[in-house]
Amino acid sequence: MHQQTLWLFSGIALVLVIATLISETLRWRARARPSAVLDNLVARIRAWWVMAAVVGIAFVFGRAGVIVLFALVSLFALREFITLTPTRRGDYYALLAAFYIVLPWQYGLVWTGWYGMYTLLIPVYAFLVLPILATIGGDTTRYLERTAKVQWGLMICVFCISHVPALLNLQIPGYAGRNLLLIAFLVIVVQSSDVLQYIWGKLAGRHLIAPKLSPSKTVEGFIGGVLSASLLGMALWWITPFAPWHAFGLALVANLMGFFGGLVMSAIKRDRGIKDWGHMIEGHGGVLDRLDSVCFAAPVFFHLIRYGWA
């Protein structure tokens, strides 16, 4: 593992240690009056420890570990999406193809580095073939809606997420062997934006930005969180091939995409009448609840780097 990666993970561990000490101290001091907010905070920090450990182990195994990790993440995310969007028996062949053919094929293409195919397989070929498979059962009830749900699930949960490990395929002059740090940069910046938006919203939030979609998101939280996380991205320029201002700009774009991606996924949840996509991650909900912002940020981040630096 590259020395910069070790320094980065050491910093993450230090932040988590401090957060753990603070949260456990607050909960101990409030032990006479149990607080659901503090309990949730402790659960979230413990979940962050697990997630950081899993990512760290994947990084130890390098390219193979990272691709396998995100393939599994896509599998769990797609399962959550399909489980909470009604399907019928007529969707059997389309779902079979989505889970057992398209998903592994997409990550196989990322593994081989075949850019021309992993950027087209799902938005072109799967987009056309899945409706054909859905017609085999002869079920036309809500046909367009059902087909669109499977297509959307593949786009969000497989196509978009696969662009995170696809960062390993970029050939950036003077940056050979360090592409894992691009993944770390993207995930840290976007996930930090989510946390900082929440903190800024609690501290200064006054005006709701989209009350029907996400009652907890405020204009102040959005501005403060996105800008703070973008400044964090600029501070992390040393792990990237970018100049500080380039790092800020890329972080800003990623954070904006992440924010609006979160709103889109919230709209889908409201449409389905659910609060969380799942319960896999304690304190965070499901995989999609934790990665909804990354889903929208990853493809844009990937292509900006590919056309600007690779």
Regions found by a protein language model. Give the residues of each.
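Membrane-embedded alpha-helical bundles of polytopic integral membrane proteins
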Residues: 1-256
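Transmembrane alpha-helical segments of integral membrane proteins
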Residues: 133, 261-276
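Juxtamembrane boundary at the C-terminal end of a transmembrane helix
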Residues: 171, 303-310
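Re-entrant/interfacial helical elements at transmembrane boundaries that shape
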Residues: 201-205, 269-273, 295, 299-300
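Hydrophobic transmembrane alpha-helical segments of multi-pass transport and channel proteins
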Residues: 252-263, 287-295
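Interfacial loop-to-transmembrane junctions
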Residues: 272-293
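Final/C-terminal transmembrane alpha-helix of multipass membrane proteins
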Residues: 290-306
